[in-house]
Amino acid sequence: MNVKVENIEKNVVKLEITVDSEKFNEAVKKSFKKNAKRFNVPGFRKGKAPLNIIKKYYGEGVLFEDAINFCCEDTYPKAIEENNIKPVDYPQIDVVQIGEGKDFIYTAEVTTVPEVKLGEYKGVEVKKVSYEVEDEAVENELKSMQEKNARVSLKEEGEIEKGNIAIIDFKGYVDGKAFEGGEAKDYEIEIGSGTFIGDFEDQLVGLKKDESKEVNVSFPEEYGREDLNGKPATFEATIKDIKVKELPALDDEFAKEVSEFDTLEELKSDIKDRMKKELSEKAKAEYEEAVVEAVGANAEIEIPKVMIEKEIENMVRDLEMRLKYQGLDLKSYYEFTNSSEEKVKEYMRETAEKRVKTDLIMQEIAKVEDIKATEEELKEKAMEVAKQYGQKDVEKTAELIANAQKAYLEIDIVNGKVLDLLVENSKEIA
């Protein structure tokens, strides 16, 4: 095998690979063995005609397609490894010379991993991130717990008041026509919650059970549906039932009912501690992100478009999987959000580019700093992932993960180590 490498543009190389005639003839014979049974030649049982007869009857090129594939599968990986080429996509293969008794020559044009010029990555200055737990946040959490533990009962008499829960049937019209998603029966709505658009809920105040009313509201300008954005609408609403909500008193008895604590003060203290931990983790994550952004701002990379497109495709697949767990699909999502595949991909582009750039920088720093994942770390990471699956035989699951996802585990571990290095060497400023 002989290989010539030509840099045809930034991050794109063309390899001209020559496979000697003897090797190519072996590939042709291999192709014959694979395809012999599908050839039907007069005078021979199907699949029993010899190679020379097949060539004469069908033409010598009949076996070239698979022979080309066999040659490329064998020689292309060796060619890129020997020339230290790191492709980011599949190559474009073009045949230059092919024929019986001739060397097989082909070109492989491929986009490569771009050069990363690291700037300063140790000692970057990043603004300190910190959060304090506000008393109001603790009170709001208590109110939320109070709401969840409220007692709800039917209001036998009287009108709808703020804070009541109304069970309604409604049907909406825009420009005098019913619209999709504008109708529901036995819909439960808390008056004053702001669930409905405009002052829909306020207009129900004062109504009694079995009474109906025409409610007039307008959709927000950016409601998210072109057919409804900013448009006035009329809803026919009928009150089916009214419920009243009784909130439990916020006292020691409440604390005992909803938690492991004996007093309200102990419950408040626990809520505050949990919030402190959450805010501390949030501050840590934001600081780490800021460090990575600062390091990225100091680096120079010309990212090939194909890398960004591939990351966008990965993001779309992730979105599709998340939707699947919710019983939805991409088509429904596009319709519901009044979007399209093109719009969603364009929206993802900036994030995709940022992800690719960050990954390239992390890989380059790992290379410079000689940061690697040890076998022990790989086992620990595989075990950590295996536990998330909830399988009975965790060790067996971890072993399968370690074998099937080794490359991903290595990247995760190495990136974590690089991030630790960057954070440890950063300078926190006020």
From Swiss-Prot:
- The identity of this protein, by name, is Trigger factor
**Per the similarity annotation, which family is this?**
Belongs to the FKBP-type PPIase family. Tig subfamily.
Which terms in the GO cellular component ontology are assigned? Answer: cytoplasm
Q: In UniProt terms, what function does this protein have?
A: Involved in protein export. Acts as a chaperone by maintaining the newly synthesized protein in an open conformation. Functions as a peptidyl-prolyl cis-trans isomerase.
Q: Which organism is it from?
A: Clostridium botulinum (strain Langeland / NCTC 10281 / Type F)
Glycosyltransferase as a keyword of this entry, yes or no, is no
User: Domain remarks in the entry?
Assistant: Consists of 3 domains; the N-terminus binds the ribosome, the middle domain has PPIase activity, while the C-terminus has intrinsic chaperone activity on its own.
| UniProt-annotated location(s) | Cytoplasm
Please name the InterPro entries in this protein's record. PPIase_dom_sf, PPIase_FKBP_dom, Trig_fac, Trigger_fac_C, Trigger_fac_C_sf, Trigger_fac_ribosome-bd_bac, Trigger_fac_ribosome-bd_sf, Trigger_fact/SurA_dom_sf
Q: Does the keyword Cytoplasm apply?
A: yes
Catalytic reaction equation(s): [protein]-peptidylproline (omega=180) = [protein]-peptidylproline (omega=0)
Gene Ontology terms: biological process: 'de novo' cotranslational protein folding; cell division; chaperone-mediated protein folding; protein transport; protein unfolding
Tell me, what is one Gene Ontology molecular-function annotation carried by this entry? protein folding chaperone
Q: Which UniProt keywords apply?
A: Cell cycle, Cell division, Chaperone, Cytoplasm, Isomerase, Rotamase
What positions does the domain PPIase FKBP-type occupy? 163-248
Known EC number: 5.2.1.8
- Where does the source fall among the domains of life? Bacteria
